[in-house]
Amino acid sequence: MNVQLLRKAIGAWTFCSMSLLAAAQTATPAAVPKPMQWKQVSSWRSVQPFSVTLSPDGQWMAYAIMPVEGDGELVVQKVRDTVKRVYPVGCIFYGVQFSEDGKWLAFKEAVKDKERKAAAKMPGKQLFDKLQVVELSTWKKTEYDKAGTYNFNGKQATHIALQVVKERAMGAKPDDAKGGDLLLVELSNGKSQGWGNVSEFAFNKEGNLLAYLVDATGQNGNGAYLYDVKSRQVTLLDNDKASYKSLNWTEKGDAFALLKMKKDEKFKSDKGIVVGVKVSNGSFPVFTYDPTKDSASFPAGMTITGNRRPYWTDDLSRLLFGIQKLEPVKKEAPKPDSAKLAARQDSIKAADAARFAKIKADTTIKTLDDLQKALAKGSPAGPKPAEPIDTVKPDMTIWHWKDKRLQSRQQVMEMQDKNFNYISQYDVTTNKFTRIQDSIIRSMDVLPKQLYALGEDNSAYEWDQNLDGQTYTDLYLVDLKTGTKTLLFEKMYYPSFTSAPRASWDGTKFLYGKDGQYYIYDMPTRTSVNITEKLPASFVNTEDDHNVKKPLTSLVGWSADNKYVLIRDLWDIWQIPVNGKDEAVNLTQNGKQNAIRYQGRFQLDPEEKGIDLKKPQYIRIYGEWTKKSGIARLEPGKIGLKPGATTLLWEDSYVGTLRKADKAEVYVFSREKFNQPTEFFATDAQLKNETQVTKNAPDKDKYMWSAGVQLVNYVSDKGDSLQGALFLPAGYEKGKKYPTVVYYYEKLSQTLHNWNNPGFSGTGWNPTLYTSNGYAVFIPDIVYKMDDPGMSAVWCVIPAVKAAIQTGVIDADKIGIHGHSWGGYQTAFLSTQTSMFKAAAAGAPLTNMVSMYDLIYWNSGGGNMAIFEASQGRFTGGPWENWESYLRNSPIYNVKKVTTPLLILHNDKDGAVDFTQGIEFYNALRRLKKPVVLVQYKGENHGLAKLENRKDYSVRMMEFFDYYLKGAPAPEWLKNGVDRLQLDEHLNTRAFEEQP
């Protein structure tokens, strides 16, 4: 053997070994993923789906990564490249704008979360945001302080305008001047010019004109102005001692409208004047309509309202606006002279004393009747003195059985009723005012092209509708050229919103539903045609299990040429000619056959006017029994779209949104799974050659997530074939059984592939946290039988859980249930019907269907009767008509059968399910000495809004399940409760530390 070679080999081995050893000693070991704890949720960062924005040229994408609590950042990166920049955005993300040429980016940077929290403790402290403007080719960033509203100048993309936020003056009043500085910046060189006291501004679509309104102290210089960006000339359009508001450009940018409001001390509201401005070959003719100068046609006692934005008709012949009643200011009666009033009162007292002394001395008074006659005879003549003007009135409400709307509903709607206004128009070519809407037609929609309007009057049916929930209305057609109205349909029935009229884009026809069929009404000819009766498909939504008659499936949309409507049956999409003569086509063809639902169309152009059948259309698809999702494409044909959809994406994930760049064939779609956060991918028109753009959830590798999901098939006790999603716990080992929480709310198995971001929900529930912490989560579907909403849950959930147990995943002795609102009701009811579950957490549950029926849904002010009879309650009448059903399905009347420990969340200001529902069940269980804890958060509504409350309950609910399902030690609040005097100390020990 060559000794030298051996020595070299040994030396090399020694050096290599030492190097590896040194590297091993200095390298940081990879962190082992752990279950996520609630205190780690606050710092969890993720992409906000609504923030994802494509540049018009398709070159750039911007998106925000925000924490649950704290400060976030904006990521700006190349769509097909790794080039990117990250910018801080503070504690709030306001959105982002690209210039139309894709060269510039602008966004607001909010204050830091620490500053926001500190300011919250200092009443009156004003915080200011910054505007950041970025040149994408160089990453040069320019910052502007005190940023308010901002916008690039449309197609020209040469300037950006920024409204600077005013500093609030001490003692500022709501009526003070609202104008502030407006800054206009030339993007290419950063040069700027400004105007003071600007309250509103807006560019036209081209971006060559900037309209702005001035609102100055003392109304000095108030008016409407127009700035030509190229010539830098300002044109004064109108000025007056008035306030100007509601600036509104037409979509084309060839005209705009606004309101001029003048104070009149005799009335509570300002008097309005509508102003219209046209853009015509370098000139800007102004059209003004002042109702005070038109006593002949404008209704007396009314004015143009400031509560509706005016706008031009498409042909620029008319201005549309709202009018409302003027409410006079009540004159205060002069207060009586205090000296004279005192003297008068002394005189009355003296006269009364003398009269009573005389009566007392009268020996002829023997009986009560004698006394009453003497008192009446001796009453002083003449009027009583006027009551002082500051007499205190009672604070009360009168509830009358003849009220069409409950007083509670009237209270909720009070401001809307006060500000109610009627659509009217002014023809600038004839100088004619026309009131389009009257007091009979309280609801009105002006249709496209402003030729017609549809109005509804439900006054004859409103009383009954508030009781039984069945919706009827009288439908009127209004000709906007003449102002004449025609009753089209009397007592038109809306089993659901899908039966309501939907107009064509040329404004001459509308689609509506009746008796399970779709019809087209032609307004110029006043004719109607049934367009679905001859088709080999039903458009009745047979899966709608509410107490309504023949609800329809949904409209996909009108075609842009107004010749077709695209309508879904339960599976496929049909292209149906509106003339009722030509042949309808099943575009998707295989939906029913393959149990694929073609759910709807992706609208890729937000400014489109109808579905362009000359372009490919992208359709969302979903596998009813596989839970797959994807995107299919329909191609243009000789007549409309070509039958037969091409599947572009079809996978075991949730394919969510699809977007397209405004000016490029660049598409972006989202994809997620139950254990994989939502990511966005750039692709082409065929959805091939995809590139992942986002990198969501930067900290996801630190934590353990669900190990998988299983689809559980089962049959309800009533023979319905149903499914449930069984999410495996993190670290799942086959053959091992796990504690499980069952969650439900009607049908949710379609969420099998949906990612649930860690967070503090308003109900305390987050399945991602539960699976991360070793729970299996099972989400079964529930379908309903009329008059048995509680028993329906029993018939579905119990067989579902039994089927899930057969998978071998679930420990049958460690199952809990949870639901909120209607799901809370199902939880409360299930706890009365079975001992299968070892713990139950019910959020805001309905517990007494008899008393709940007659209570108020305080958030809307309406009664619960309509909800019970035509909506979620699924009863066919009131309790007196269906007594056994109400008792049979009420947790409170079955409370003696409860064996499951119960945690109830119910808040004292719950405006959906009255707080008394939780109290009733709690007290009944307590009376029966059954384990129950009710958690109440003061001032909270149906769900928890305050972050500190959401944090607190999220932890408590998991502690509850940990104790009963995992055998963890019981916290003191669960074991023995907390006395009132110790509550503050208890809460202090549990409070989350504020995030740095």
Which sequence ranges carry the predicted segments?
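Bacterial Sec-dependent N-terminal signal peptides
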Residues: 1-30, 846, 863, 996
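Glycine-rich His-Gly loop
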Residues: 458, 622-623, 672, 743-747, ...
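Cap/lid segment of the alpha/beta-hydrolase catalytic domain
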Residues: 534-546, 687-689, 694-814, 818-820, ...
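Secondary-structure transition/capping motifs at alpha-helix termini
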Residues: 218-219, 265, 281-282, 478-484, ...
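Beta-propeller folds
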Residues: 16, 22-678, 682-683, 971-979, ...
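Active-site-proximal cap/loop segments of hydrolase catalytic domains
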Residues: 757-996
